[in-house]
């Protein structure tokens, strides 16, 4: 039989496993991969293939992440799993692997632990919109009441961080026993093994509870300006990569950031030296702007659909500060620290005014390797929105990464 060609007929969703160390995140990833491979559309990935996660760089930070893909009857998934706790923190803050939703893994034998709490907090801060919970190691719990207690504790913890604790699906099972059953019998079908069935139940919950994300092209138009030049007789061209949305010749847009917001009309679009009628999310494109001088627009501004993004100077953010070994600072810093914030395409100087620990108390200083909530104020207003990622730099060297959790001014 000839191999069928891969066609993306199903909606695509990015998810990941989060939770405390040793609660079984990677085993669960392998169990899902193995279980769904029995449906025949994707090959199983083994535990050690996932565990030996390759290094990748995002915003100047090295992160280990494993990427696994699999399909249910309804969807195509890309799943990320990180080997170490620090990798999770860095991945979630840099948005290296975006998550439309996540499976929170909690050991039914131990209940929620410190990193369970930390990952829920992080998911909230960095904008992972939806969680589903897998209570792993159910085989190690003899008492049904204990299982109910762990679930109750989990739901309370989720509600504490503004997730809908009462509505989130909880599925109990054993990733290890499911993985062993499928490994022993790769042709296993739904209904033949209780542990494998629990993985199917989990994925059913993921399929129905985690919404299909809005595609980038369906969002409102935004492009960060990377370069500007003038074409004699035609006007000013701003180039960059379209972050989201669609743009057409004749559309009205706003130029936002660094100066007064102004409105202009698009008179032409170019890509690879050719003119085109519309540009889509992901395109590297040149946009010809009506009545705009080269001196009026610069790198660091954004072009956007009118009324969709505004310039700001003050925000709260969740940040990760690199260790010395990662190429970061060797010494701590204190409130009043003035680094550059690299946002989209440009550096803007700002002051960090305050640090807040996870428990809500003020922190006096920040050490390399810390994750902290901070309040910053930029010297120039730029286009900022909740969930936006940035790097913290000192003289061109990345010393941290962050994500905007709240706009203040």
UniProtKB/Swiss-Prot annotation:
Domain tr-type G: 10-214
Stretch list, region G4: 136-139
Gene behind the chain: tufA
CDD domains, per the entry: EF_Tu (cd01884), EFTU_II (cd03697), EFTU_III (cd03707)
EC class name: hydrolase
Pfam families (UniProt xref): GTP_EFTU, GTP_EFTU_D2, GTP_EFTU_D3
Region (G1): 19-26
Keywords recorded for this protein, A-Z: Chloroplast, Elongation factor, GTP-binding, Hydrolase, Magnesium, Metal-binding, Nucleotide-binding, Plastid, Protein biosynthesis
UniProt key word Plastid: yes
Disulfide linkage: none
Name of the protein this chain belongs to: Elongation factor Tu, chloroplastic
Region feature (G2): 60-64
Lineage of the organism: Eukaryota, Rhodophyta, Bangiophyceae, Bangiales, Bangiaceae
Reactions mediated catalytically: GTP + H2O = GDP + phosphate + H(+)
Subcellular location: Plastid, Chloroplast
